[in-house]
Amino acid sequence: MTQDEQQIRDLVRTWMEATQAGDTETVLGLMTEDVVFLVPGREPMRKEEFAATARAQAAPGGPRIEGRSEIQEVQVAGDWAFLWSRLRVKVTPPGGAAAVERSGHTLTVLRKEQGRWRLARDANLLA
C-alpha cells in the first residue's frame, strides 16, 4: 500500500469516527472548500449546507449516528484520487423513535492540497 493510499484510508477512518462522535469541525476539515455532495433525488449540496446540517445533528438532543465504511478500491493519479466503498449508516433519532438504516455504495473524488488529501466530490448511493 502506498503512502497516499494509507492517508486516504486514514481520512475515511477519521471521517467515520468524527461523524459518530459528533465532531463536525474535524469532518469539515477533511473536505475541500468547493466540495460537492451528490445524493439521489436531491440537489447537489455544498460545504455550507453540509456544515449547517452536520452542526444541527451534532447538537445536544440530535440523532445518534453509527456507520461503517468498507473501502473497495483506491486509485491515485497525482494530486487526484478516487475511492469507492460500501457504506452502512444507522441514524437513531432522540426520544426512542425507530432507527433508520441505509446502505449502499459511494464514489468519492479526493484532491491533495498542501500535502493532505481532502474530499472534493462524493456521490452517495445509499438506499
Locations of the language-model features?
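A solvent-exposed, acidic/Ser-Thr-rich amphipathic alpha-helical stretch
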Residues: 5, 11, 24-77, 86, ...
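Generic short beta-strand segments
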Residues: 85-92
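A short, structured loop/turn motif at beta-sheet edges
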Residues: 74-81, 97, 110-118
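C-terminal-biased regions
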Residues: 63, 90, 118-119
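Short beta-strand edge/turn micro-motifs at domain boundaries
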Residues: 103-127
